[in-house]
């Protein structure tokens, strides 16, 4: 029987059969829906905030949006990773840093968020606490660490420690602030940072960075 050109091509071709994509589990589907719901909530809050004239109230709405975004990011990571209830903090902080750079930094003025984060796996609720801490500190740093119109960087660093835990550092190179005053955190944001750090069961401190200020959180083996 004569072989056609198509037959020869089909006979000689190497066909790579890709494994089917994993079916989303019930928890994946829940995380996907939660992330979508939080995105909808964020859009509603954003629409409401556009009509506010009072700068203090507007700032409170903006911070609320960032807190919602930090929580939604955890659920997006859970849905994408198919790792059950565990979140890769490195991937999560990379994404969160980009979102914070877009929302609170000013790249045109030379203000950036730099992230160097190791791929530490943590539980979802732990990642949520870390996200809220980072969002609060980065936002506050761009508000107060640098003079209006001045360039500046806020860095987020995460590394695994020898004892099976991790060390988180959020640092600016700005005007600096009294670590004792920062630790007291009389505003809602400062209180949230303290509450979340305590919830994680680690040791946290505000340090002089010379120049600037550094927040450090060390969490032991989980």
Model regions: which residues?
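Acidic ATP/Mg2+-coordinating residue in the GHKL
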Residues: 172
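Short beta-strand/loop element within the Bergerat-fold HATPase_c
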Residues: 151-164
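Conserved phosphoacceptor histidine of two-component systems
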Residues: 24-39, 43, 47
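ATP phosphate-binding glycine-rich loop and adjacent ATP-lid/helix-beta elements
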Residues: 179-207
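Conserved short strand/loop->alpha-helix "switch" segment adjacent to the catalytic nucleotide/phosphoryl-transfer site
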Residues: 13-31, 85-87, 104-135, 142-153
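C-terminal beta-strand of the catalytic ATP-binding
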Residues: 217-222
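Glycine-rich nucleotide-binding loop
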Residues: 165, 176, 209-216
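Conserved DHp (HisKA) dimerization/phosphotransfer helix of two-component histidine kinases, i.e.
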Residues: 40-44, 57-110
């Amino acid at each position: 029987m004569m072989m056609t050109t198509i037959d020869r091509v089909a006979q000689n071709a190497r066909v790579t059969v890709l494994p089917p994509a994993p079916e989303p589990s019930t928890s994946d589907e829940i995380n996907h829906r939660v992330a979508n719901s939080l995105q909808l909530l964020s859009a509603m809050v954003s629409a409401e905030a556009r009509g506010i004239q009072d700068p203090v109230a507007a700032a409170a709405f903006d911070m609320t949006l960032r807190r919602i975004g930090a929580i939604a990011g955890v659920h997006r990571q859970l849905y994408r990773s198919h790792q059950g209830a565990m979140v890769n903090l490195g991937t999560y902080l990379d994404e969160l840093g980009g979102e914070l750079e877009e929302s609170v930094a000013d790249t045109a003025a030379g203000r950036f968020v730099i992230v160097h984060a190791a791929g530490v796996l943590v539980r979802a609720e732990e990642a949520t606490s870390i996200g809220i801490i980072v969002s609060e500190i980065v936002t506050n740093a761009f508000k107060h660490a640098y003079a209006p119109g001045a360039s500046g960087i806020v860095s987020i660093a995460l590394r695994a420690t020898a004892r099976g835990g991790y060390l988180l550092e959020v640092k600016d190179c700005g005007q600096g602030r009294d670590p004792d005053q920062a630790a007291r955190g009389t505003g809602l944001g400062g209180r949230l940072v303290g509450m979340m750090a305590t919830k994680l069961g680690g040791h946290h401190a505000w340090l002089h960075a010379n120049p600037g200020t550094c927040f450090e959180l060390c969490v032991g083996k989980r």
